[in-house]
Amino acid sequence: MAEKKEFVVGIDLGTTNSVIAWMKPDGTVEVIPNAEGSRVTPSVVAFTKSGEILVGEPAKRQMILNPERTIKSIKRKMGTDYKVRIDDKEYTPQEISAFILKKLKNDAEAYLGGEIKKAVITCPAYFNDAQRQATKEAGIIAGLEVLRIINEPTAAALAYGLDKAGKEEKVLVYDLGGGTFDVSILEIGEGVIEVIATAGNNHLGGDDFDQRLIDWMAEEFKKQHGIDLREDRQALQRLRDAAEKAKIELSTKMETDVSLPFIAVSPSGQPLHLEMRITRSLFESLTRDLVEMTRGPIEQALNDAKLSPQDIDEIILVGGMTRVPMVQRFIKEFFGKEPNKSVNPDEAVAIGAAIQAAILAGTEGAKGRDIVLVDVTPLTLGIEVKGGLFEPIIPRNTKIPVRKSKIFTTVEDGQTEVEIRVYQGERPIARENIFLGSFKLVGIPPAPRGVPQIEVTFDIDSDGIVHVSAKDLGSGKEQSMVVTGRHKLSEDEIKRMIEDAKRYEEQDKRLKEEIELKNRADDLAYSVEKTLKEHGDKIPADLKSRLEDMIRELRDAINRNDIPKVKMLFDDLQKESMKIGEYLYKSATGGETSNQ
């Protein structure tokens, strides 16, 4: 029997919808329809009471009847400790996402008449390490070898960039999907697509626009009938479906009618119907601030790339929400030019992923294609050092894959272990950033503080997943970890980090200066104390006693966090300790030292 043919695919695992595509032997890319005949599969999973698992359109269709056992927008929970509980079983976000990937895989295998083992899967550029790791795990659970995790805007630009070979351009990808917003600036030319800046909001998308319409309709109905439809799960589900449908219709029409018969029952037992007309201007007034929220990340990305809006050659729209006329108007007003609408906003990401998959797998259709994707890390990575400061090792917007090292040392005499605490963020104080995980390097030979040399290395692979290692250069002892931190921060924390860094810049600067002063004071106290122990017999007793008192007072001020006193005593101790050298020289030469 002939072996089944193997295919390599690209998958856009989206918050609202997912898409799968492959590159044909002739080099063109085909979006693969699902079993229902649609090129887009809703990212919805349902568990029926009989134990059947429904995915995609069948799951979405029964949401009204089975809201408690239906899961949508699970992508927002990727990389967190969130669990979905159905009956007595708990599911991680990775497992729910794997059901979606498995459906895409199975339907595509049936369509292509072969096997799919390898895939490139996309994620938002702003996904942190834990979220990328979770995306990769979802692929593995679904039975896929994940060739690479690539950023959605990068994939979209790849789909677009093929037609632009030989022309150097700066392209801004504006990606407003169901649950996330990303903006990336790319340089495209000579077969290289390079991300030069990325920013975004991990908690802004079509779901939020739907919610505004749901709330408006619910409030209007409540005014008329005194019943809040949001308190009834099935009524809320019908409202949600109607809101999504109205939003889509208002992209091409100036108004739409919503009709939901028998949505509730009055206290007297009368059936109640919801009949409303929603105009485009009403929809725009309800959601204008959401569109405005995309301005900050655009400005951030332009600022990071050191570009003005006029420097951008093309603006590509990605994500179904970019069909909304108000979004397109906003972009035109911001950049002073029309966005490029030649890329299908729902399919571009999957097409780009399929191209990258074909290139990585070396398939027939990709022969002669030499495209290099250069991604960047979205937030600075580093470790906590003495005094709780954050020491950056890989700055934000560094091209990946990347490997960087720095040498650190011990802060106590005889210290035999160090804890490496890894953080991601833009604040100079470690605890203000996202904690990604920690590990201990043990077995350091005892030595005075400052003597051991510990090399800390950060290695980010092509999927954006972080590997951290620490090596004691003296003993050769080494310890490492792959960052899989499932931090419990809310999802919009990442988006806020860069804004926080700006807002707290002055406060952080002052705090950093205070910590650095205390560190310098502590180092000086240690150094003077060590000199007194080693050469005490050569120093007059009154100077030695005075210095010991000053060291004691300085350490007390450090412990009490009395910064003005630390500064004063640090300066005094510096001046007074200069006299030690004078006596050591006198002792060494056996002569008198003249006073200046």
UniProtKB/Swiss-Prot annotation:
Q: Which GO terms describe its molecular function?
A: ATP binding; ATP hydrolysis activity; ATP-dependent protein folding chaperone; heat shock protein binding; protein folding chaperone; unfolded protein binding
Instruction: State a single Pfam family of this protein.
Output: HSP70
What are the alphabetically sorted keywords of the record?
ATP-binding, Chaperone, Nucleotide-binding, Phosphoprotein, Stress response
Is the keyword Nucleotide-binding in the record?
Answer: yes
Induction data: By stress conditions e.g. heat shock.
Annotated positions of the Phosphothreonine modification: T180
**InterPro entries to which the protein is assigned, alphabetical:** ATPase_NBD, Chaperone_DnaK, Heat_shock_70_CS, HSP70_C_sf, HSP70_peptide-bd_sf, Hsp_70_fam
Which top-level group of life is the source organism from?
Bacteria
- Outline what the protein does: Acts as a chaperone.
Q: What is this protein called?
A: Chaperone protein DnaK
Q: Which organism is it from?
A: Thermotoga maritima (strain ATCC 43589 / DSM 3109 / JCM 10099 / NBRC 100826 / MSB8)
Taxonomic lineage is: Bacteria, Thermotogati, Thermotogota, Thermotogae, Thermotogales
Whichever gene encodes this chain, its name is dnaK
